[in-house]
Amino acid sequence: IIPMLYAYYHQFDLHPETIIRGKGNRSGAFFIFWEQSFERLSGEGIGKNSPDYFFFFHTFLWVFLPWTIVGLIAYWKKARALVMSKFKYNPKSEILTLGGITFIFIIISFAQFKLPHYLNIVIPLFAVLTAAFLYDAYEEGKQRKMKILLGFQYFILSIIFIASVMICFFVFKNDNFYSYLWKGALLILIGYYCLKSEDYFFKIITIGALSSVLLNAVLNTHFYPSLLEYQGGSEMAKTIQKNNIATDNIYKISLNYSWALDFYNQEPVKITTVNALEGKKNIWVYANDKDLKELKQSGFDWNKQFTEKQFRITRLQSRFLNPNTRKQVVNKMHLVHID
């Protein structure tokens, strides 16, 4: 935690003159430990982005894959047992895990500014709760219960398999022969363990682990690399590096965010105006279609232009995932050289 506090000390305490969200003279430690947390709850300063009180519930459904169904059953069983006991103290029963999950879920669900990663704090608690539930079921030796849980795991595996096929053959069609080899080998391995005779408890664990491996392998080796091709900023950064363009000589004439380009260039794009550009020579302008039109109407011309596809990849939608309608929502970002 020391590097984080050191960074916030440099950003806030050493620059009291800096106005951040309408306030100056801020303490970095106070901001990260107190202010920003309560600002997210109230929406003050940071803004409001979701009135959906069930946002984290339906987010949890995919975040906790492939243990989602088992995890929800574990929570329900634990909560039901606590209610049925009328909350009486039981030295053999642990309630901190259940209480932690419930308390945090309630707090973050009422936050006015919500992001999926808020769930990170409850995932370990859910993992402990789920593992304890599975172990207790195994110790009880109730084969029928274990068989039902295994059925749920097979259901999750089938959903992940269908999603993987759709990703590889429809959303972003894969033409790499070598990619088919390892995917085929993984499917053979999964098939082997599905058919292998094994105790229900161990099979639940095995199927869950293989589901996780399949999902993450497809996402990290195919889906996300393909998706990043539509993040104009990161792709343009590759072009900038390839053509040895000076990153301190790049400007933009709008207030549109350029976080990806800033990050991969390791330098923020300078903000300017069309009028201010008139006195500059040998510069590059990072622009969208609207900005290019404005430059053209203002009498600017350029001798070099690089163009990349642009889509806000953190806001996926069906029209983008469907290759037949993708062009309708994909924009373009340009880098032009004004001599």
Where are these regions (language model features)?
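Extended hydrophobic-aromatic, low-complexity segments
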Residues: 117-119, 130-131, 137, 177-179, ...
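Hydrophobic core segments of alpha-helical transmembrane domains in multi-pass membrane proteins
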Residues: 120-125, 179-188
